[in-house]
């Protein structure tokens, strides 16, 4: 529940629906019809269709940047029309993140109260990272005819089972009345690659390519580096795909790498070890992809 009851409700909307037709507009039109005072923020509608893990990456950090009371409507629904239902959860807390571990807006009175945010998504693993990073207080299967159509369009569950109920929640419909409570084991999750220690090295994977820049992100977090005694200024060897070693100091900015094209090893804005070329692409000329191994060690 929002700390300020006079604040306009907010829905942050992420999907794989694209922007080449009226699908997103239909969803947003229904949101405004159900909750006329709502502000709908478009997070992203161009994620790779049906890629649950990519979608999970786009939504996990959002609470750091949104006011208390925001409803996050997040969807990629490959099983549309089946028995897969949506799940609505109240997260426990907005976890700290970023390269330095700070809150967005820290120092400006932006502390978040526990239980301030609701996510609604298909129960297909999309909330995996959210639940692991933030924890949750309550979770429900979204089945009530008060918040979803009695005969939902089977090919458009993103609209029927996510967008519409998110608007009811933003309008104040009680979370506990959207459907039956879910046990933890009933919430679908995917397996996240673990970061492991191999001698003095940390071993993870390439978690994302930062398009369109061609920067390479790994799943090795700032906290993993801290435990290994690695901080800014340490000279690192980062080996990708087992055969591509790059060496550079860990620096806060791309410009610290010096000339254009030089290698920069840095922490991205989400707090994960990353590698780039200053003002140039690294991923594209080296054909780097998600899922490749990433091994880092101090030199």
Curated annotation (Swiss-Prot):
UniProt keyword S-adenosyl-L-methionine, yes or no: yes
Superkingdom of source: Bacteria
Residues reported to bind S-adenosyl-L-methionine: 16, 21-23, 77, 158, 210, 215, 269-270, 277-279
One Pfam family matching this protein: SAM_HAT_N
Effect of residue 158 to G: Weak 5'-FDA synthase activity
UniProt EC number: 2.5.1.63
InterPro entries reported in the protein's UniProt record: Fluorinase, SAM_HAT_C, SAM_HAT_N, SAM_OH_AdoTrfase, SAM_OH_AdoTrfase_C_sf, SAM_OH_AdoTrfase_N_sf
Keywords: S-adenosyl-L-methionine, Transferase
Regulation: Competitively inhibited by S-adenosyl-L-homocysteine (AdoHcy) and S-adenosyl-L-homocysteine (SAH). Sinefungin is only weakly inhibitory.
Enzyme class: transferase
Keyword tRNA-binding: no
Molecular-function annotations in GO: adenosyl-fluoride synthase activity
Protein family according to the UniProt entry: Belongs to the SAM hydrolase / SAM-dependent halogenase family.
Function per UniProt: Involved in the biosynthesis of fluorometabolites. Catalyzes the formation of a C-F bond by combining S-adenosyl-L-methionine (SAM) and fluoride to generate 5'-fluoro-5'-deoxyadenosine (5'-FDA) and L-methionine. It can also use 2'-deoxyadenosine in place of adenosine as substrate.
Name under which the protein is recorded: Fluorinase
Organism expressing this protein natively: Streptantibioticus cattleyicolor (Streptomyces cattleya)
């Amino acid at each position: 529940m929002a700390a300020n009851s006079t604040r306009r409700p907010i829905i942050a909307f992420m999907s794989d629906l694209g922007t080449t037709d009226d699908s997103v507009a239909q969803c947003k039109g229904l949101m405004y019809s159900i909750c006329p005072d709502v502000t709908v923020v478009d997070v992203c509608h161009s994620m790779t269709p049906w890629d649950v893990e990519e979608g999970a990456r786009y939504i996990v950090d959002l609470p750091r940047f949104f006011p208390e009371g925001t409803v996050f409507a997040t969807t990629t629904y490959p099983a549309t029309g089946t028995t897969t239902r949506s799940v609505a959860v109240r997260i426990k807390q907005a976890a700290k993140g970023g390269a330095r571990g700070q809150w967005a807006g820290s120092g400006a009175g932006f502390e978040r109260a526990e239980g301030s945010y609701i996510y609604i998504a298909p129960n297909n693993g999309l909330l995996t990272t959210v639940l692991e990073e933030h924890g949750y207080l309550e979770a429900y299967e979204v089945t009530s005819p008060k918040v979803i159509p009695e005969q939902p369009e089977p090919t458009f569950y993103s609209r029927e089972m996510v967008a519409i109920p998110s608007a009811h929640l933003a309008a104040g419909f009680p979370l506990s009345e959207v459907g039956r409570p879910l046990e933890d084991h009933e919430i679908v999750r995917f397996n996240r690659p673990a970061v492991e220690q191999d001698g003095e090295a940390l071993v993870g994977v390439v978690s994302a390519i930062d398009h369109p820049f061609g920067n390479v992100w790994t799943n090795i977090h700032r906290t993993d580096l801290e435990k290994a005694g690695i901080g800014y200024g340490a000279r690192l060897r980062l080996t990708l795909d087992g055969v591509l070693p790059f060496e550079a100091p860990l620096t806060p900015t791309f410009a610290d790498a010096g000339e254009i094209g030089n290698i920069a090893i840095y922490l991205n804005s989400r707090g994960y070890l990353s590698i780039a070329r200053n003002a140039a692409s690294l991923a594209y000329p080296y054909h780097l992809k998600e899922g490749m191994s990433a091994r880092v060690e101090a030199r």
